[in-house]
Every structure is written in C-alpha cells, then in structure tokens.
C-alpha cells in the first residue's frame, strides 16, 4: 500500500464516505487512490467552494468535513474556508498535496509554504515528513478536529510520500480531553441562580457543536428562564418557547437586547461575547453577574469577566445547574417585551418586502429544511424572520462573515442530507462570489433551492454608507448584474423572476415543490435596510429603528 492509498484507507477508517475537492499535480496519487477507493468524491469548481462545502457537510451532520486540494494555488484557495471554519469552530480536515520532499524550499513549481500560511487559520497543521508517520498524522488530524472546541486541521503531504510504498500499521489515538468537573464552581453558580431576580440565558454556537441542544431544552423546561441566541446559536432554543426573545446583538431583537441590559444574572452557554453581540462592551449587561459555561478555557474572561467560569461539557454542566426558579414577574416582563417589539410585516406598495418574503418562506418550508445563507442584509433578514428549529438547520458564516459561503455550503448540506430540502438564501453581491458552484449543482443534479434577493447593491455596505458615511456610495452599485435566470439556465437549472409581492406565495410554492435545483430571483428595493441596528460604538440600549 502506498501513501496515497493509506490516506483513502484512513478516511474510510474514520467513517468518511464523502469528500470535496479539486485535483492537481501534487495530489494526483491521492486522486488515483480515490478512483476505486470506496470514498465518494464531489468535484467542486473552485477549492474555496470545496472547503465551504465541507463546512456545510459538517454543520448539517455533526461529522468532520473533508476537503482536498493540490499544492500552490490549490492549497491557498482553501485558506478562506479554513479561516471560516476556525472562527465558527467547525471540524474540517483539509488534505493538500505538496511538492516532493527534496524540492521543498526550492521555489519549485506550485510550491507554497501552506503549513506556514495555515497556522493562523487552523486548529493545527501537519507536514508529513515520512511515510511511517502518515498513519499517526491522519489519525491525530481527525482527533484534533473534533475534540474539545472543534476546528479545522490541515495535512500537507509531499507527492513522493504519497507514492512511496511500505507496510504501514494502523494508528489508534485519542486526544486527551478529560476536564475535571468543577463541583465547587457549580455549587456557587447554583446559589447565584437561586438568588437571581432577573436571570437571562445567552446561548451561543457551542451548544450545537457540543450536541447539547436536548440538555439546553431540558434546562429551559425546568427553569423557564428567558433566553436569547447569537447568530450561530439560532435553533438551539425552540422558536415557540414562551420566553424566547430572539437573536441578540447588532441586528438582534429589541426585546432580547433590552432584556439583557436589564438582567441581574447572565448565563453564557457556549458563547464568546463577540463584538457583534455586545455592542459597546463596557455597557453590555451592566447590572449582571456572569456565569460563563464553555469547553474552551481560552474564552473564559477574555472579553467579559465571569463571576463563575465553568469549563467543561455542556451536557454535564447544564443538568447540574438545572433547578426550578421563582421569577414570574421577570418572565411576564420578558414576554411583554417580546409582544411589544414583535416584527411588523405591513409594507406599502407593490414591491417585495424581503422580511415578509422570508417569513412566508419560513411558514412553508418543511420541518427538517436546511437553510444556508451568504453574508449581508439577506443573512440578517434570514436570521430575524425564519423560525429556526435546530442549529444544524441554519448554516451561515457568522464569525468570518464570508461572502460566497451560502451556495457551496448548501452543496455540502444537500450531499449530506439528500432527502431533506436545502434552501440557499443569497444576495446579488454574494452570489457572484462562488457562482461557479452552479456547475457542481448541475453535475450532481442536487435539488437545492436558491432564493436570490437582488437589490443591485452591496446592500449592507450601502446601508452603512447611507447611515455613517454621509450617503457617499462608493463602489456599492451592481446595476451591471447578469441575467440571473439566463445564467441558471446555462447550467440547466430552472427558475423564475418575481418583482411584486403578490407573486411571492405562488413562487415559493413552485420552488419548494420543484423536483430539481431551482433559482428564485427576487427583485427588492435598493434602499431597504436591516432594522433594528446598534450603531458602531453604541450600547445595545441605543438601537436605531429607522432613519431619523
């Protein structure tokens, strides 16, 4: 067995049945092994698309996603996807070819120090330096990617090592991830919770990554505590939970932001006090003591000092804190905040109102539908107006905010869950970033649906130029967009273009009931903004609702 064949053998041993990639010279031996190696390979049209498809696959399944690329430009094209996976704590293993070992450091054709490049955007990176260490490195790569706080790992394999043959022994390893249960700290936290008059649960993406959604929901059922979610935490709390206040932060609900500003105890669960959540940090939850629960000790006290820091598995910590609470007045106050600041969908004129369209999509989509988004105004509207059922059913780039993420992530999700509906919500700016992945959709006849909100603008940047840069609209106009339906048709994808709100419901039904891939091109008002908004440098109490 040569090194390339061992790579494929190691993938099978890890339970990997699908990988995403793009071949090239330095990775050709691995592709030769994939030819009849028992692992399905999905050919993407760009290595960045392969990395983001691997993220979508990982998010939709909870498994480790795998992407493969050649040396040089193939490897560098993975970098944005790896950075995205790192910031959102997604388990991904990237396998790259490298020039043969004797040529490393000689500026050989398509040689790039991808190990050095990737150090800042991976949890760990390996350069395989001998055939004998390949089994260990492949095993450790998967252990590191999915243990503790998950993240991306890169394995760079010189071509001569891929071709070398030898008797390789399986390597069995597990990363030591035992965390001592913090008994004393848990007891202190229980006492704080029992005394609190206005407790609030702040739920982040770590809950879904820890597969702790059932534990969280049991905790809420027992405590009846008001709760809010970050962008990546959406779906962890059931949308119909009576005391769920919606998303927190810059484009969060007024109810969530106001309640957090009032609370006297904030329990952060798998969350990291990101700047898009907190607004002006020293004014965030000013009256609250903080209990911070997370698997990653590096997040403790990084941005907000915790009165009690609980490091460990959320599946153990949440039940340990669970207790009935007497907080009727606070519960009713939060429910009243939610009712007072609920979304309003009345909108004058015939133009399509994007928030209402997404609400109508939410009402129609199947229960197990996976929604992916790109980045921009449409992303925030999707976060606000779609009822999210589980974290794995809402896949978005929250930490890095990567335009072009939505379509390849939808590809990965659809491959992972072929029997579920997958809808990609995109904007005309983001869509063009990785539009080539329509070729992947066509090649595999993936039945994913695309809702393309087209305002002929880079909408979020334009909104900020309008609000904070004196309406100096610099390079945010996209009036030269292609004919999106004709573009989709060139890839054999059917679609429809709508411009009026009375067309929306029928168009959504047609899209969702279509058998194959479908593009719904939606023209919206170029000046429609995302509200509410916490301005830069402001407190979450100072939300803008409209232009003054």
From Swiss-Prot:
Ligand binding (FAD): 149, 251-272, 294-313
Annotated positions binding Mg(2+): 428, 455
Signal sequence residues: none
Keyword list, A-Z: Amino-acid biosynthesis, Branched-chain amino acid biosynthesis, FAD, Flavoprotein, Magnesium, Metal-binding, Thiamine pyrophosphate, Transferase
Cofactor: FAD; Mg(2+); thiamine diphosphate
Molecular function, one GO term: magnesium ion binding
EC number per UniProt: 2.2.1.6
InterPro entries assigned to the protein according to its UniProt record, in alphabetical order: Acetolactate_synth_lsu, AHAS_TPP, DHS-like_NAD/FAD-binding_dom, THDP-binding, Thiamin_PyroP_enz_cen_dom, Thiamin_PyroP_enz_TPP-bd_dom, TPP-bd_CS, TPP_enz
Activation and inhibition: Inhibited by the herbicides chlorimuron ethyl, chlorsulfuron and imazapyr.
Cofactor note: Binds 1 FAD per subunit. The role of this cofactor is not clear considering that the reaction does not involve redox chemistry. However, after removal of the FAD no AHAS activity can be detected, indicating that the cofactor is essential. The large subunit alone does not bind FAD, and FAD is not necessary for association of the subunits.
Biological process according to GO: branched-chain amino acid biosynthetic process; isoleucine biosynthetic process; L-valine biosynthetic process
Domain of life, source organism: Bacteria
Chain positions covered by the region annotation Thiamine pyrophosphate binding: 377-457
Residue positions binding thiamine diphosphate: 47
Top-tier EC class: transferase
Reactions it catalyzes: 2 pyruvate + H(+) = (2S)-2-acetolactate + CO2
Annotated metabolic or biological route of this protein: Amino-acid biosynthesis; L-isoleucine biosynthesis; L-isoleucine from 2-oxobutanoate: step 1/4; Amino-acid biosynthesis; L-valine biosynthesis; L-valine from pyruvate: step 1/4
GO cellular component: a single term: acetolactate synthase complex
Family the UniProt entry places it in: Belongs to the TPP enzyme family.
Described function: Catalyzes the first step in the biosynthesis of branched-chain amino acids.
Extra remark: E.coli contains genes for 3 AHAS isozymes: ilvBN, ilvGM and ilvIH. In strain K12 only the Val-inhibitable ilvBN and ilvIH are expressed; ilvGM has a frameshift that disturbs the ilvG reading frame. IlvG (this protein) is Val-resistant and is expressed in K12 strains having what used to be referred to as ilv0 mutations. The ilv02096 mutation (shown here, an insertion of 2 bp, PubMed:7015336) causes a frameshift which restores the open reading frame, permitting the expression of this isozyme. The inactive N-terminal pseudogene fragment is found here (AC P0DP89).
Annotated PANTHER family: ACETOLACTATE SYNTHASE, THIAMINE PYROPHOSPHATE ENZYMES
Assembly and oligomerization: Tetramer of two large (IlvG) and two small (IlvM) chains.
Name of the featured protein: Acetolactate synthase isozyme 2 large subunit
Gene symbol of the encoding locus: ilvG
